[in-house]
């Protein structure tokens, strides 16, 4: 089954809000073995919406339209779909009663715009909205399936999972099923990953896809088969070939995060951590504390941006700052060691660098970063030169720092 997604709303078209529906629906449909062939975003314009819908019907088996179901004059989805399909709009009394009840609870008078939400193309199955006032619709006509969903994400997900998912799963069950696995890597570039896997690519089914983020590469294995067991077997067999080639760079799979993996290792080893940050501005500490229960292993952190703070709070000696500068191997080590002493933690990370866009010199260019890890009995420090704009350099640095810690914890005996 081939699917096409049409996202309506001028706010999406202009980039005023993020289109999270594309990711959510894409993952839901691909997980059922439904192939998504095209995304279209169209503004609140009747003629353009009609053209997009008409073209989608000609190309695809399943058309999902999101947004445009509200009470205002620019909410045109139901009217547009009915017009293209040559169907009249008819009142659904049950939907109208539900809308009236919501308005009464809120102490509001029912408007004509609100009533509009209770009209649907003739023959449509009405999908109740448990989190809002605008119902959706499911239409089967001439061998095509048209699914109409609300725009707000929390309304869309509830309606899709409660009403549309069971129907689509049954339809998709008659065709191919898709399964996938995602490896998450750090400390390696996308081109290096592709080089290591070049003889495994190009199979078509299963297939390998790559996605790069600052400091992280994702390798996605995807397979289609007539049943879930066979599809999973195809994924697992390819994963078994990939893992040995990338073992040292893989930090997790699926929804795992680097900070979550590091947290688990710290708990397993019964070790505590603190961080001293300069160029990352607290990003490492923020990510570590995103993990529930991180207080079990994370003692705290300091953002020492100025030389004065490095000296007064972390105890970085003035002669190190004078002789080597704030961005240096020596300063990074002194930051990590000073933080570990102050926090009383088993381990500490010290980070200093030049995130840019200014501040770089010929000897110390933009993107130069030093990352130190202090532990009982010593410290290590690594030098990096990251490329990209300021935000990317900071993200690369945070990921690399946590990966240095991860690799240390993996080699440290219990």
From Swiss-Prot:
InterPro entries: CinA (IPR050101), CinA-like_C (IPR036653), CinA_C (IPR008136), CinA_KH (IPR041424), Competence-induced_CinA (IPR008135), MoaB/Mog-like_dom_sf (IPR036425), MoaB/Mog_dom (IPR001453). SMART domains: MoCF_biosynth (SM00852). Pfam families: CinA, CinA_KH, MoCF_biosynth. Belongs to the CinA family. PANTHER family: NICOTINAMIDE-NUCLEOTIDE AMIDOHYDROLASE PNCC (PTHR13939), NMN AMIDOHYDROLASE-LIKE PROTEIN YFAY (PTHR13939:SF0). HAMAP family: CinA_B (MF_00226_B). This is Putative competence-damage inducible protein. It comes from Pelotomaculum thermopropionicum (strain DSM 13744 / JCM 10971 / SI). The lineage of its organism: Bacteria, Bacillati, Bacillota, Clostridia, Eubacteriales.
């Amino acid at each position: 089954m081939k699917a096409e997604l049409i996202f309506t709303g001028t706010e999406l078209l202009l980039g005023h809000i993020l289109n999270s529906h594309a990711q959510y629906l894409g993952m839901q449909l691909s997980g059922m073995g439904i192939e998504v062939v095209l995304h279209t975003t169209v503004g609140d314009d009747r003629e353009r919406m009609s053209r997009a819908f008409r073209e989608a019907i000609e190309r695809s088996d399943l058309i999902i339209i999101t947004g445009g179901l509200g009470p205002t004059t620019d909410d045109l989805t139901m009217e547009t779909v009915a017009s293209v399909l040559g169907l009249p709009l008819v009142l659904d009394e049950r939907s109208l009663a539900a809308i009236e009840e919501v308005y009464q609870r809120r102490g509001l008078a029912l408007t004509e715009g609100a009533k509009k939400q209770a009209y649907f193309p003739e023959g449509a199955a009405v999908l109740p909205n448990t989190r809002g006032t605008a119902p959706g619709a499911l239409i089967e006509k001439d061998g095509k399936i048209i699914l109409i969903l609300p725009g707000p994400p929390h309304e869309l997900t509830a309606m899709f999972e409660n009403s549309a998912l069971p129907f689509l799963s049954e339809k998709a069950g008659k065709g191919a099923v898709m399964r996938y696995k995602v490896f998450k890597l750090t400390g390696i570039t996308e081109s290096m990953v592709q080089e290591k896997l070049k003889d495994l690519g190009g199979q078509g089914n299963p297939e390998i896809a790559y996605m790069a983020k600052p400091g992280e590469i994702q390798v996605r294995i995807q397979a289609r088969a007539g049943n879930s067991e066979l599809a999973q077997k195809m994924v697992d067999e390819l994963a078994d070939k990939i893992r040995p080639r990338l073992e040292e760079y893989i930090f997790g799979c699926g929804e795992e995060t680097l900070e979550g993996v590091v947290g688990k290792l710290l708990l397993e080893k019964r070790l505590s951590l603190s961080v001293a940050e300069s160029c990352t501005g607290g990003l490492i500490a923020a990510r570590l504390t995103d993990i529930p229960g991180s207080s079990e292993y994370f003692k705290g952190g300091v953002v020492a941006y100025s030389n004065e703070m490095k000296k007064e709070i972390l105890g970085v000696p003035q002669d190190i700052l004078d002789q080597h500068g704030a961005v240096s191997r020596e300063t990074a080590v002194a930051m990590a060691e000073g933080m570990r002493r102050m926090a009383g933690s088993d381990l500490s990370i010290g980070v200093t660098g030049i995130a840019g866009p200014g501040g770089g010199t010929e000897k110390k260019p933009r993107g130069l970063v030093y990352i130190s890890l202090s532990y009982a009995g010593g410290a290590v420090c690594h030098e990096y030169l990251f490329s990209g704009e300021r935000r990317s350099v900071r993200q690369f640095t945070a990921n690399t720092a946590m990966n240095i810690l991860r690799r240390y914890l993996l080699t440290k005996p219990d």
